[in-house]
Amino acid sequence: LIFGSDPMAALKNLSATDVLKIKAYDEYENTKTKKLMYRGDLTRVLNIETKSKLISSWKAHLLASTGSNMDSKNDRGKFRKGLGLTTNFFSEKFLLTSNVFHNNINRKSNNIKNVLSISDPGSTYNETTYADLATERSWDTENGTYGTFRAFYTFGYNRDNTNTRSEQHYFPGNNYQQRLYEEQNSNSDRKQNHYSEFSFSNSNDKWGEFRWNQLITYNNNKDWQSLYIYNEENNLQTSKSLMHYDNLNKNFHVKEDVSYVNSITDRIGYTLESSVDINKGKNHSLRIDTLESSTTQTYLTIPSKLRNTEWNGNAQLIYILNPENDTQISFDYSVKYENGWKHQFAWNMLSPTNPQTDEANTYSYKINNLTQKQEVSFHFFPFQKTSCDISAGLKESTLKRKEKEMDNYRKTFISPTVAISFVHTDITKSWSAAYRLHNFAPNIVQLRPQIDNSNPYMLRSGNPNLKQSYLHSFLFNCNRMLGKHNHTIGVIINASIRQHSPVAKTTYYNAETYLPELQYTAPAHSSLISFENVEGYWDIKGKLIWQAPIRSIKSKYTLSTGFNYEHNPYYIGENKTTTRTYDPSLEHFLLCSLTKRLKVTISANTHYVHSINTENYTGKTFYQTAGAMLDISQICKYFYLSSHYNFIFSRDYGINKEINRNHTLNLNVGCKVLNRKGDISIAAYDLLNSHRTFNSQMYSNYIQNTWTNYYGRFFTINFAYRFGKVKSNYEGTTNDGSIREYRPMSGKI
């Protein structure tokens, strides 16, 4: 919602000269919750004192944009356009808002600031249409009953287009000295979605708090993909293929949540929660594969259906040991039960009169999963201004899968859960330290030994022998104010260690190979990517931040330096290999408010990524970015200007020696019209025509370079108009020119 859930938005309905005092704080919605659940959910409250008492207000924003591409090579969205209207009504207890917007300038919101934003519009061509309606009603009575009802509906239609090209340069191996895998991917999709949400909450000091929430979504999506694959070994072409995908997907999702909070005594409270989540869908895919010749062509039609239902329940009991120092203990029990099925059939229609079943893409299975968790939590203050939370429990997950074509699967995973945290807060310093043990059971995709040949040269399969994995995470955060000049220094350290981490295991076949365990023949020069548990993964990330105000130029300067290290093991065939990645960085950020109407932001980032694996093959990339933003809110009373410049330089010292320079300049110039309630502006993106979307990264045994087509070079002429009315006990005009209605008051003010 524009208002209600976001209390800061309420200030948009008030004149700045009308506001006397603003007090912001967080409070518990239920007064008994305040007494019993000190760690419950809080809601932000704004108490605003005004000269006049606001009764209600309504406002509307009208937006219109028209423009064109500035790149003659870009055949998508040559005519750029946008049209939208936002209306909202605001009062103390009733809120109503509606939005309608259509554009192909890659904007997801019709907020005027977002539409006129000079930020990068992105490399994807996107055409969006959406409409939504939202309302909120609140009430309270003298007997202590208060509640809220919210309703929201939105319709969206999106069209996206992306074009990418990627190269994977492999390090020398047992089967080759040089290997290149190249993909050219063109993707277009159409997404139509309906989303609605209803929520109701009612609180009473005697009977507790009841909440209900319903969420319904319906999606109807279509996408088309064209994929060209090229393989090369020892500088000779080994294979190539061209694949076309047409996909139609329909999905329906509904979720119901119910919760109840109350107390037994002044020290004992409880919470009951329950939810059901139903998801079902239909999918129909058409796939044409052309490998090295027409004799290997396949024409697959693949219809599928799925349904999944999930029930969740949670019960919590809290006992206040000492109300004076907020010491409490809680007992939690949660259960999740999931059952579902998926049926998929595939036929090769290359010969329509004699269709053949495609075994690799035909399967049917059912799943039944049960997860239970018991946990005890203790909250206390061991020292002054220092709180401590300790929790420990046990989690049990039972996974079941029934499938005719392969062995059924049933396994139970039992693991502990542990969390310890300390938080210290003071006026000039604060710190926190935490340890948490996470556990992850493998999912159905990782466990099913079923071949996925969506890409015939990058085959994928699960592993039914996977173990559950554990993640030990450590966090330390410290902030301290230095001296009398409000300088602050902060330290952030994160570290994690993984046990039984599921990683990719890549096996390469230089000749056509039959895989008996998967009942599939892998084509020559293809790879099979499966999962395997591995030990030895760990990483550490650290950052030192210094902030200092520069009062002479009304500025704030931030300097931060960081270092990241990752120790990442994986498998190449049966050989365990490890990649070590070092990533030091240095950042500068300067925010200047030179005058009330002039703001300047300058930033720079330098970092170097050095990766090396067990075979001493390396990837080395240097990055340097710099940016500047200039915002002049008023020029000659009616005009304004915003500009954003961004420079990106990267150089690869590895296999391809790629050098990338990227200069992006976006500009927006406008003027106020119609008594300052309207805006006319011109926005232009990538004026220098030097934007390149390139990325290079080292993976297990290869370095991948990716180029993405850029659709963000265009200009628009924009018109925005604001209008509305405010009703209050004050006669006059607001600072945006809208007229206040006068309502006489009885008695003295």
Predicted features, each with a name:
Residues 82:
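Eukaryotic intrinsically disordered and solvent-exposed regulatory patches
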